[in-house]
């Protein structure tokens, strides 16, 4: 194979040199320059062959374009592959655009997909937070249908285990699609002082973050450093949950929930554990020095997503990218962790216990839905698009 490749390149070099010489057949070249010319021709030919060899790599499609073009998840057992900022996931499900205590924002982005555990947790948080006095969740970006690098925005959110929740409570009216696309979020942090705007902060914000941190699945909650400081300054009594709340750039209008690698995802790369303590120490004080806010010395440096090709991602992500579509988005929308993800065609009503059992889930009452209490069951798997 190697010899054949070398012979091919040699033949290409000879053809190039012959064609290049033909351009100068009618030009009289002084004798001292002829030897130099032969060397120059050979050099040009080698460079041309090298350029041709490098061209496929340079022209390889960016992974963000490939994953960003997918409108539906890959039908498979739920599995996160790679790291939060370099990976993909299969078997994703969508959170419904509307729930009893949540609404999805910016729906045109098609980023309401995640690992079933992530989606179930968001729905659970919406119910628990409502019991704590939070009117309802405005759900931001979760992941693309198959994860992977995004066309815009996040570096992470690639393996279905990250989700953004706005720090603006859900209004007491249903938002139109236009409002969800254009409604501005409330910025809670002053960009000059990096401190929370006291007039906008309420104890309900603290309760919401504490509730999110209370779940065993949650490993990190990313917030603006100003919000972390506000919590450090005001939380009394139990402060153990503050360990999960980590300061990071941005996150001034939403918080970022990150859950750990889930069972059935052997190729998922876990993040390091958070440091012991409540995080209200020198590591937080650093955020209120000049260093974190200095201008970027190389603002034109490409972002990772603008360089990542499929070769940059775990090899298993190619199979995820090529995996079969489900019948529809509705067929893989997660209506509460008590209702199976629809199997095959679109469901117009909750499945009967017999159908639920046939799909691999435990038997459920036919009336179970996102508006009812949800029993603990296994996660059923969606089936491929019929005929596909």
Which residues does each PLM region occupy?
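Bacterial N-terminal signal peptides
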Residues: 42-51
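Catalytic cores and adjacent binding grooves of peptidoglycan-active enzymes
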Residues: 60-62, 175, 179-380, 384-388
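Sec/Tat signal peptide C-region and signal peptidase I cleavage site
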Residues: 53-59
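Active-site acidic/histidine clusters and adjacent loop/turn architecture
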Residues: 75-140, 201-211, 215-218
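Acidic/His-rich structured neighborhood in mature extracellular/periplasmic domains
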Residues: 131, 144-198, 257
